[in-house]
Amino acid sequence: EKIEAAITPKTTAIMPVHCYGKPCDMDGIQNVADKYGLKVIYDAAHAFGVEVDGKSVLEYGDMSTLSFHATKVYNTLEGGALVVKDEKMKQRIDYLKNFGFAGETEVIAPGINGKLDEVRAAYGILNLRQVDMAIAARRQVAIRYRETLRNVDGVSFFDDIPGIRHNYSYFPIFIDAKKYGMSRDELYFKMR
């Protein structure tokens, strides 16, 4: 409903975020996009390795953006990736990330050096070998957090959702200041 309310005649795409690795309502979003003839570009910076019913969240929409920053569950220390379904769009992105060059003598548009350097690419290849172990370790930490926090008044959190393979990249908690006895910000500054 909020997405539909925000659509104007100038809208060309919906850009939802899989925040904290928690998948959006991808079917609902796609239904709205189809109704209005819009593209769907997902911000999947937090969602590497996340699946819904065995299907990667990267398979939904027209494009997904990934961050490979050092703070992510899978990283190359810096950089990222685009997952694009449309071959024509992929080709254009390939040109733009290579200074706009479409060949040795043809420049199609102003571009950037958007390629991952060799060191980060090698680091990423090595990290792919252990990303499943990293996710499994993060899952165990999330289980301990839940066991510890489940009975604390005023503290709530996301539970695992059946059919979703999480990456446990983050463990956000929600603070009810009245029940907990202090606000989220007060707790944050106390724990610093």
Regions found by a protein language model. Name each.
Residues E1, A5, A13-V17, K22, ...:
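PLP-dependent aminotransferase class I/II
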Residues K2-T76, A81-V83, K88:
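Active-site phosphate-binding strand-loop segment of PLP-dependent enzymes
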